[in-house]
Amino acid sequence: MPNRDMLFSVPIANLGDWTFDERVADVFPDMIQRSVPGYSNIISMIGMLAERFARSNSLVYDLGCSLGAATLSMRRNIHVPDCKIIAVDNSPAMVKRCRGHIDAFRSETPVEVIEADILNIDIKNASMVVLNFTLQFLEPSQRQVLIERIYQGLNPGGVLVLSEKFNFADKDVGELLFNMHLDFKRANGYSELEISQKRSMLENVMLTDSVETHKARLADAGFEHSEIWFQCFNFGSLLAVKAEEKA
């Protein structure tokens, strides 16, 4: 059983901004299951996408890998030879635990876990790239740059999987889905204090975009095909496919 997230169950005088530190890493599996609707579905389906898109003699990237859930899902479903997964996170606590999770399972598909800023990673020869609830933590000015670098590093026919929390131009819809997400967290045992304190810590470091903004950014980078393939309330995932080279 994962350690239960009780980090915000008592009042904290000086909340500060959110960091993925040792305390968060220790309860992260429980936290994300109870906080992100559809998370386990997205993880399992990322594995299905890897089975379809991963190619031999190519690289697969998990950028912002946290504890390696998406990496493990992909590795279980990659059945082609000479395909390597590169998992990257800038949190030492996350990377340490991720390496332990990866090493606990045997596989023919090698995984390299790197502690680094994903903006400094050279993306090349990629058949698949995953940004699973990662882009929203980057400075908005850096997001287009990263998406363009991913596009350039993808091989023709390669896929980017982009999972995010969304905001909405339609304020009525946005408010409804926001409140449904609050109900989801309450149903999973979070108190009003826990919800409020976590939101206060995240509000300066997690800046969300609309689906339309994501699609425009993908198109500007060169992706000809992009669409939402999963959504639950104000959380979801898009895929963007780099066009095959024309004969």
Swiss-Prot record:
Instruction: Give the protein family.
Output: Belongs to the class I-like SAM-binding methyltransferase superfamily. Cx-SAM synthase family.
The entry's keywords = S-adenosyl-L-methionine, Transferase
Enzyme class, broadest EC rank: transferase
Q: Name one GO biological process term.
A: tRNA wobble uridine modification
Q: Which Gene3D superfamilies match?
A: Vaccinia Virus protein VP39
HAMAP family referenced in this protein's UniProt entry, alphabetically: Cx_SAM_synthase (MF_01589)
Sites binding S-adenosyl-L-methionine sit at: Y39, G64, C65, S66, D89, N90, D117, I118, N132, R199
InterPro entries the record matches: CmoA, Methyltransf_25, SAM-dependent_MTases_sf
Stated role: Catalyzes the conversion of S-adenosyl-L-methionine (SAM) to carboxy-S-adenosyl-L-methionine (Cx-SAM).
Q: How does it assemble?
A: Homodimer.
Q: Which gene encodes it?
A: cmoA
Q: What is this protein called?
A: Carboxy-S-adenosyl-L-methionine synthase
